Amino acid sequence: MKDYQIEFIEFALEKQVLKFGEFTLKSGRTSPYFFNAGLFNTGRDLARLGRFYAAALEDAAIEYDVLFGPAYKGIPIATTTAVALADHYNKDVPYCFNRKEKKAHGEGGTLVGSELKGKIMLVDDVITAGTAIRESMEIIAENGADLSGVLIALDRQEKGKAELSAIQEVERDFNTKVISIVKLADLISYLESQGTMDQHLASVKAYRDQYGVA
C-alpha cells in the first residue's frame, strides 16, 4: 500500500466516513463496514479529499483531458480533484458536471463547466450498481467524447447479483478501467497491520469470503 492510501483510510476513519458494525445495504446484505463519503462535508475535508483523488489519478497514469463529476455527489469531487491537481501537480485540468434537470434559460443545457470533449475521466464516490456510470456514459457519448477511465474512493470488491462486481461489469461493458483510492483488500491489509481491530478484521474477512469477487 502507498502512503496516501494508508492516510486515506485513517482520514475516513477519523471523519467516521468509514465505520464498522452491522449495516444493511441496498442489496439486502448485512455488511460489517459502511462507507459514506457524504460525511466529508467541510472545506478542509474536501481539500484533503481532493488530494487523495489527485494522488490516485497520478498513480494510475491514465491519459485524460477533462474531469467529469456526475450530479450530485460527483460535483464537489470533480471540483476538489481539479483544484488539487493544479495545486500539487501543476496540472490545470478542465472539469465539467451535469445538471439533473435541463435549464431552459441562460446558457441552457445540462452541462456546467468545461466542454465535455476528448478523453473523459469520470470521478465519483463509489460504484454500487453502476447505474450512475451508465447514465453518465450516455451524456459522454452524446457529446462525442470518450470515457478514458473511472475514479472512485472505495472499491468494495464485492459480487453483484452474478459473479462479477458492479465495477467489473462497468469495466467489461464500457471497455474501461475503474481505479480507486483504496480497495477492500487495502482495508484488510490496514486492519491486519493495526493489531487493535481484530474483531473487525474477522468480520470483514468473513464477508469477503462470502461475497468477494475472485
Swiss-Prot record:
- The enzyme's first-digit EC class, named in words, is transferase
Q: In which pathway does it act?
A: Pyrimidine metabolism; UMP biosynthesis via de novo pathway; UMP from orotate: step 1/2
Q: Which cofactor does it need?
A: Mg(2+)
Keywords in alphabetical order: Glycosyltransferase, Magnesium, Pyrimidine biosynthesis, Transferase
Query: For orotate, which residues are the binding ones?
Result: 34-35, 128, 156
Q: Which residues bind 5-phospho-alpha-D-ribose 1-diphosphate?
A: 26, 72-73, 99-100, 103, 105, 124-132
Report which reactions are catalysed by this protein. orotidine 5'-phosphate + diphosphate = orotate + 5-phospho-alpha-D-ribose 1-diphosphate
Recorded E.C. number(s)? 2.4.2.10
Q: What does this protein do?
A: Catalyzes the transfer of a ribosyl phosphate group from 5-phosphoribose 1-diphosphate to orotate, leading to the formation of orotidine monophosphate (OMP).
Subunit annotation: Homodimer.
Name of this chain's protein:
Orotate phosphoribosyltransferase
Lineage of the species this protein comes from: Bacteria, Pseudomonadati, Pseudomonadota, Gammaproteobacteria, Alteromonadales
